[in-house]
Amino acid sequence: MTNIRKSHPLMKIINNTFIDLPTPSNISSWWNFGSLLGICLILQILTGLFLAMHYTPDTMTAFSSVTHICRDVNYGWIIRYLHANGASMFFICLFIHVGRGLYYGSYMFLETWNIGVILLFTVMATAFMGYVLPWGQMSFWGATVITNLLSAIPYIGTDLVEWIWGGFSVDKATLTRFFAFHFILPFIITALATVHLLFLHETGSNNPTGISSDMDKIPFHPYYTIKDILGALLMIMALLILVLFSPDLLGDPDNYTPANPLNTPPHIKPEWYFLFAYAILRSIPNKLGGVLALVASILILILMPMLHTSKQRSMMFRPLSQCLFWVLVADLVTLTWIGGQPVEHPFIIIGQLASILYFSIILVLMPITSIIENSLLKL
């Protein structure tokens, strides 16, 4: 008799995805972050659902409804902080996941990579809209500043911004629609993640060497299920330490002041995970140029397969490219720091240099370095 796990239409899908999946025997802990992202997504949907039961998307009551969740709802405070800091965990895992893809050449799986870039954009949009919902000062002014960037689009810009706002400023209509989108987008992300996984399983996983591992595969269960559970426990532990000991560490104190359109905070800045892109935006004095650079800083990922000039897929055996990769990581950390600083000397020039370096490494230095490494192979 055939095992039900392999014959039942639903069980068969689960079996081929999480149990009998042939997996390279040498994938390292850097491959754990896909499953961690899945766990983050489930956590965000569940905590978000319970928050939505008590939240009111109205300018008059939004701020007090969040306060009510923290003060009066049973364990509301932990649900709220798990959701807020869960977003930070989500982005930490996302950045590592993308970085792993860049380092080991996973972008050569075109469909998987492109859907991943779409997922990144969608998650960023969802997080931005979620930040607006508590209706604190930084929520309101962040929404005003970021949506206003669309006014840089020639001819249709102003109309587009007012259409998104649902009026002549960020107001009740904006908050209501942001709540609606923030609620629906995680389910779209889940669907996209399923397609992401579907395309990945068409080709099989990459591995640290970047060489085909068809002759050396092991079943996903029990080896990688155990490994993923360990990764999940470590991540949940880190998240709980953050939530229970310093829940406001990554937030902005300004967001504990109710939104006031008549009073602008001294430094308007988004959440920490957008600061690198915000720094690139601010480093260009022209509004349209800044917006284009902001979009390009993420969209550049789509070009990675075309910029790959090396004969080797992975950076594992390419020390020069490795150095450049870690310079890129340091550059992104620098941009994140600059994004949170006021617009004054010396931060302006540091931000401009870091932005130039970011695009130079990806578009110029990495392809040239790969060509040099190719020639070194012949020696």
Curated annotation (Swiss-Prot):
Details of cofactor binding: Binds 2 heme b groups non-covalently.
Residues noted as binding a ubiquinone in the record, renumbered to the chain: H201
List of residues binding heme b b566: H97, H196
A single GO BP: mitochondrial electron transport, ubiquinol to cytochrome c
Listed GO CC annotations: mitochondrial inner membrane; respiratory chain complex III
Topological type in the membrane: Multi-pass membrane protein
Residues spanning the membrane: 33-53, 77-98, 113-133, 178-198, 226-246, 288-308, 320-340, 347-367
UniProt KW GTP-binding keyword: no
Consequence when changing L328V: In strain: Isolate Bba1
Keyword Cytoplasm: no
Keywords attached to this entry: Electron transport, Heme, Iron, Membrane, Metal-binding, Mitochondrion, Mitochondrion inner membrane, Respiratory chain, Transmembrane, Transmembrane helix, Transport, Ubiquinone
Chief place where the protein resides: mitochondrion
Entry binding sites for heme b b562: H83, H182
Cofactor requirement: heme b
CDD domains in UniProt: cytochrome_b_C, Cytochrome_b_N
Compartment list: Mitochondrion inner membrane
Sample GO molecular function, one term: metal ion binding
Functional description taken from the UniProt entry: Component of the ubiquinol-cytochrome c reductase complex (complex III or cytochrome b-c1 complex) that is part of the mitochondrial respiratory chain. The b-c1 complex mediates electron transfer from ubiquinol to cytochrome c. Contributes to the generation of a proton gradient across the mitochondrial membrane that is then used for ATP synthesis.
Quaternary structure and interacting proteins, as annotated: The cytochrome bc1 complex contains 11 subunits: 3 respiratory subunits (MT-CYB, CYC1 and UQCRFS1), 2 core proteins (UQCRC1 and UQCRC2) and 6 low-molecular weight proteins (UQCRH/QCR6, UQCRB/QCR7, UQCRQ/QCR8, UQCR10/QCR9, UQCR11/QCR10 and a cleavage product of UQCRFS1). This cytochrome bc1 complex then forms a dimer.
Miscellaneous: Heme 1 (or BL or b562) is low-potential and absorbs at about 562 nm, and heme 2 (or BH or b566) is high-potential and absorbs at about 566 nm.
Protein family per UniProt: Belongs to the cytochrome b family.
Identification of the protein by name: Cytochrome b
Origin species: Babyrousa babyrussa
UniProt lineage: Eukaryota, Metazoa, Chordata, Craniata, Vertebrata
